């Protein structure tokens, strides 16, 4: 039975290369049962009887590692039973190295209306250093092709504080990103994750990362430059021109529920956060057995309130106290008043009418501030 959920995340775990910083659920595409995977994924999607979605996000891995015919099967299968009149945003992630003319033609024929390109950096030497196979020229070619095909809602991902990266290189990246004339970008500082090439190098003392002060300077520079170029810094890592915020990601930060479909995907349905089987074979067998999930966590009200704060405070607009009280039936001031007043005094938060939100300094310290909202 379709509850009021209006968002879904679909995971395509295949990649044409494995990047040195990535710990997402993914496998090298060669010799993988891709067609069988798509069949099983669509079977899982159909099991939820999804008809009305506001946002649909296809991520990975690399969805564009699929061939053009496979992409067509996926997009057709996901959208044929949807009421497209309510679908506001359908995003697909793409790799500048493998988005050819045939694949763009498939996207154009489908309801996809937003493309997110994993650029990471414009520096060819750095791209090689982080395990990416595309080149700077591929980025420009892809963006030109997408614009020519009529896509105006294009986003790119960039990473800063990369090994050996200088402030001059960050400035160069930001200037090149702005010159693309696109309405959205996400900029993430490099985070070292377990089971990645970079983490192994760091443990061996072979990864020269920028110092924390330089990373903070990079972050400040990025914000100032993008705001000067007409972008709004609407979430810790995200910048958009007016009206081009990622609606799907805003759904996450509003702590709304969503379906997670595919190997290793996470979802949040009826107060339950779940994760699907990750290894492809395990996932295929699980779908055949009628349940793709490997873990389920029933969130208590306390956990739901904590998540509401952690996620909501990532947004520039912060958290609405009235919405919080309406959602949970608890006094916001009774739970968090003292903590908020303390953080306001430290210059990390501000109260703006009905909303509490982070200051610029608070945003940079993101997680440290968020930890204060853990309820004992």
Question: What are these model-derived regions, one by one?
Answer:
Residues 361-376:
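Short, amphipathic alpha-helical interaction segments positioned at domain boundaries
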Residues 10:
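Conserved N-terminal Rossmann-fold NAD(P)-binding element of oxidoreductases
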Residues 13-26:
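Local cysteine-cluster metal-coordination motifs and their immediate loop/turn environment
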Residues 3-5, 26-48, 52-330:
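C-terminal scaffold of the Radical SAM
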Residues 344-354:
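A short, conserved structural fragment
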Residues 329-344:
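Short amphipathic alpha-helical interaction segments
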Residues 355-359:
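Minor-groove-contacting beta-hairpin "wing" of winged helix-turn-helix DNA-binding domains
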């Amino acid at each position: 039975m379709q509850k009021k959920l209006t968002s879904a995340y679909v995971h395509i775990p295949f990649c044409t290369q494995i990047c040195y910083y990535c710990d997402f659920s993914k496998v090298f595409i060669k010799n993988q049962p891709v067609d069988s995977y798509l069949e099983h994924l669509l079977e899982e999607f159909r099991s939820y009887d999804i008809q009305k979605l506001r946002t649909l996000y296809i991520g990975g891995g690399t969805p564009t590692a699929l061939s053009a015919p496979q992409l067509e099967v996926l997009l057709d299968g996901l959208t044929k039973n949807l009421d497209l009149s309510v679908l506001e945003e359908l995003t697909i992630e793409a790799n500048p190295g493998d988005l050819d003319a045939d694949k763009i033609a498939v996207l154009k024929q489908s309801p996809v209306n937003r493309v997110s390109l994993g650029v990471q950096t414009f520096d060819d030497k750095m791209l090689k250093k982080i395990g990416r196979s595309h080149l700077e020229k591929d980025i420009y070619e892809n963006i030109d092709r997408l614009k020519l095909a009529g896509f105006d809602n294009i986003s790119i991902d960039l990473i800063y504080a990369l090994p050996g990266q200088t402030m001059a290189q960050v400035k160069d990246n930001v200037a090149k990103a702005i010159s693309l004339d696109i309405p959205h970008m996400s900029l993430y500082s490099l985070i070292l994750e377990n089971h990645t090439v970079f983490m192994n190098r760091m443990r061996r003392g072979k990864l020269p990362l920028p110092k924390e002060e330089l990373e903070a300077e990079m972050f400040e520079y990025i914000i100032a430059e993008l705001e000067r170029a007409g972008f709004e810094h609407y979430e810790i890592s995200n910048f958009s021109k007016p009206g081009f915020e990622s609606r799907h990601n805003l759904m996450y930060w509003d702590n709304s529920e969503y379906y997670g479909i595919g190997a290793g995907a996470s979802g949040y349905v009826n107060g339950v956060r779940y994760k699907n089987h990750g290894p492809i074979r395990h996932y295929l067998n699980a779908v055949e057995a009628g349940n793709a999930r490997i873990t389920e966590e029933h969130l208590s009200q306390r956990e739901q309130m904590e998540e509401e704060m952690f996620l909501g405070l990532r947004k520039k607009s912060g958290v609405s106290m009235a919405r919080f009280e309406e959602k949970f039936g608890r006094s916001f001031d009774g739970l968090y008043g003292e903590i908020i007043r303390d953080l306001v005094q430290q210059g990390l938060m501000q109260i703006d009418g009905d909303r509490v939100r982070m200051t610029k300094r608070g945003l940079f310290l993101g997680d440290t501030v968020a930890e204060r909202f853990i309820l004992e």
